[in-house]
Amino acid sequence: LTELPFTSIESIGPCASINSCVADMAQWLLLQLDSGRLNGRQIIPWPVIRETQLSAMVEGDIHSKLFPAKHFNTYGLGWAMYDYNGVKVIEHGGGANGFVTKTKFIPELNLGILVYTNTDANSLYEALATQIIDAYMHLPYRNYSDIYYKRYANATAGDDAQLADYKKRVDAMAKPTLPL
């Protein structure tokens, strides 16, 4: 392993502007699940919280081999929303500089999930969050880690060969006649 310096995220702005920890984000999730209240105190008015959790636009194709019972897939003010086994899931994921996170909550179940990883080359964060939801809902076990890994492996299977081909083609190009 090689330690990398922590870099500033100022240049990517809102894309990765939350620098936080699990303890603080857990408080944020509790606030989301309790209509803007935290520890019995109204921090953000419920109409404001509700507005962020309403659908503002439809997102892509809802049909999925992995989740064939999905009925909607929308986006609100910063939150993706979809149904999963009869409940509305609200989520947002993101990442930068080698970190990827997933925040999910299901108001009907009073369930919030945070997954923080220090990798961005796979979908472990999504697999783990879905595994937790299934266990919480007492759904039959599915090995999402294996499912998502196979999808990742299939998607990246030809990467090394493609890079080698690109390098070979670049190396075969005419060289400049004068020194650079």
Which residue ranges define each predicted feature?
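Catalytic loop of the DD-peptidase/beta-lactamase superfamily, centered on the K-T-G motif
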Residues: 3-180
